[in-house]
Amino acid sequence: MFLTDKVILIVSPEQWGKNYVSKHHYALELSKRNNKVYFLNPKQAKVKNSCEKITDRLFVINYNSIFRGLNRFPFSLRKIIQCYHASMLIKIINHNIDIVWCFEPYRFQYLSVFSSALTIYHPVDIHKSNVERDIARNARFIFGSSDKILSRFSDVDKKIFKVNHGLNEYFLNPKKLSKSFIVNPNKINVGLVGNLHYPFLDCDTLSDIIQNNSELDFYFIGP
């Protein structure tokens, strides 16, 4: 299967917006390969089901969920509710879905409800949840951005692949890359690139590192 001319559903724990993290970049890049990509926002209360066009090949889906605390129930019951939600989303998309690419374990542990040829569970963070075992067992492939993340699935009988975070072509092109933001080019400059909105970012340790290395300049880059 080539990743072109497919209908792809991306299940994201972060909403579509101005700040992009890995899920948003995957959606954008996959849409550039002539795929029709549907980016599923986290479920929200009191929101009408909708499909917003971002580009000709990229759409954002908002949907309402009347079910709360679903992951406290047995898997057999969750499966029934997930079938209902999947049917609702397929109606919104109005296409058969070729690939379900899920970045979080909380909404659809039983990915087969979408009747897709390919299902991927792709954690880029460590999720401390019992339901993660269910989605790992039911996905066809498991991707992960680090060995530490993937080691948690060593006992799951699935094909597992390490997929590092990507780098935009912009940063590899010296003609496009701007370094004008560097104040002191003759000093040692330290860069941190990542999701600065991450709720578990160890700000105290970062502050200690900066204060104990005053001879260096630090640049934090990211949403």
PLM region descriptions:
Residues 1-48, 210-213, 217-218:
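N-terminal subdomain of nucleotide-sugar transferases
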Residues 84-92, 108-109, 113, 125-145, ...:
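Membrane-proximal helix-turn-helix segments that form the acceptor-binding/catalytic region
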Residues 99-102, 111-127:
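Active-site proximal beta-strand in glycosyltransferases
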Residues 148, 165-166:
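Carbohydrate-associated surface elements
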Residues 182-201, 207-210, 218-221:
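Conserved donor-binding/catalytic core segment of Leloir-type glycosyltransferases
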Residues 47-94:
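A conserved catalytic-core segment of Leloir-type glycosyltransferases
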Residues 130-133, 167-186:
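Acidic anion/phosphate-binding donor-loop and adjacent secondary structure
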Residues 38, 101, 138-146, 160-161, ...:
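A short beta-strand/loop micro-motif in the catalytic core of glycosyltransferases
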